[in-house]
Amino acid sequence: MIRNGHGAASAAGLKGPGDQRIVRVWCDGCYDMVHYGHSNQLRQARAMGDYLIVGVHTDEEIAKHKGPPVFTQEERYKMVQAIKWVDEVVPAAPYVTTLETLDKHNCDFCVHGNDITLTVDGRDTYEEVKQAGRYRECKRTQGVSTTDLVGRMLLVTKAHHSSQEMSSEYREYADSFGKPPHPTPAGDTLSSEVSSQCPGGQSPWTGVSQFLQTSQKIIQFASGKEPQPGETVIYVAGAFDLFHIGHVDFLQEVHKLAKRPYVIAGLHFDQEVNRYKGKNYPIMNLHERTLSVLACRYVSEVVIGAPYSVTAELLNHFKVDLVCHGKTEIVPDRDGSDPYQEPKRRGIFYQIDSGSDLTTDLIVQRIIKNRLEYEARNQKKEAKELAFLEATKQQEAPPGGEID
């Protein structure tokens, strides 16, 4: 177990002075390529109770039921631990959620999104807890999925960037990525009821939908806490694209620089990131990157669309005490100047070595190297989902009749 230190009372199952029992909530999953959709699910789950425990599956279990994960289990444990709504992480959680697991961790119920998770033989992994009435559902976040992110990496296009329309080429690729050659594993046609819910023979759970950023979503993710007297304001800036372990390790080290840190992360505009990263970077647009970083427990505030050069105006406005950068290359601004010139002049610039070598480039390389495996994984996953949906509809059909 990996506890995140939210208080001994919570871990013990007590609320405090009145010794009132707290509600302990269980979530589990692969949490591979963690994005703001995962974070939003955990945020919703935490709101249903007082203490959130998250079980993460092993590489072996994921490979057996879904296909090879992008990240190792140790990387995935650490990513989930860094999400601010998580109180405790349970490594090597079983793929099928049972009452035994909930009882072992003293959890009242488990929470999952309104999509389906199936075993290798097509069974609902939450069937047992659903039948026992210890299952709760939260809304799946529209507009983001591992499928979509992998598709963006494999197809070199900038259509996902802010203020740009999705190109027909990207839409065609996104719609077909992971789509099985036949609607069902046996190649059978889908019933009219299922077909109406699954246009083009695609699962409603695996695929791409449009992400619509709202102010409410940002408010839900933000802490809303201003810097307090005695806190050290630390500023970091970058793309923070595909928010990953390398970012978490860096921010964790930054967090250790002060007894009471208040970390502000400045996120550059998509066009600025593309200037210094090239290709089709950033993989995630500014709105998506904002939510990903806001979900991190080591970040207090985010500047959306921060200037590339850290100016005197910015430092004065936020009353910044320290400015930090990792060991990645510092690319000059458009005019050739050092973007950290002002904090260096003030003597408040620190370069941090987090000890992690993982970068967004390396993640993309992992995906490209294993492209065929990931596409096959999605085809297998979607075929199982469609077969499950078809079987469910047939069970719901009136005896001796067709589904209307």
Curated annotation (Swiss-Prot):
Pathway: Phospholipid metabolism; phosphatidylethanolamine biosynthesis; phosphatidylethanolamine from ethanolamine: step 2/3. The modification Phosphoserine is found at S356. Disruption phenotype: Homozygous knockout embryos die after implantation, prior to embryonic day 8.5. Keywords: Lipid biosynthesis, Lipid metabolism, Nucleotidyltransferase, Phospholipid biosynthesis, Phospholipid metabolism, Phosphoprotein, Transferase. GO terms for molecular function: ethanolamine-phosphate cytidylyltransferase activity. One of its GO terms (biological process) is phosphatidylethanolamine biosynthetic process. SUPFAM superfamilies: Nucleotidylyl transferase. The modification Phosphothreonine is found at T359, T360. Coiled coil: none annotated. Gene3D superfamilies: HUPs. Ethanolamine-phosphate cytidylyltransferase that catalyzes the second step in the synthesis of phosphatidylethanolamine (PE) from ethanolamine via the CDP-ethanolamine pathway. Phosphatidylethanolamine is a dominant inner-leaflet phospholipid in cell membranes, where it plays a role in membrane function by structurally stabilizing membrane-anchored proteins, and participates in important cellular processes such as cell division, cell fusion, blood coagulation, and apoptosis. Belongs to the cytidylyltransferase family. This is Ethanolamine-phosphate cytidylyltransferase. It comes from Mus musculus (Mouse).
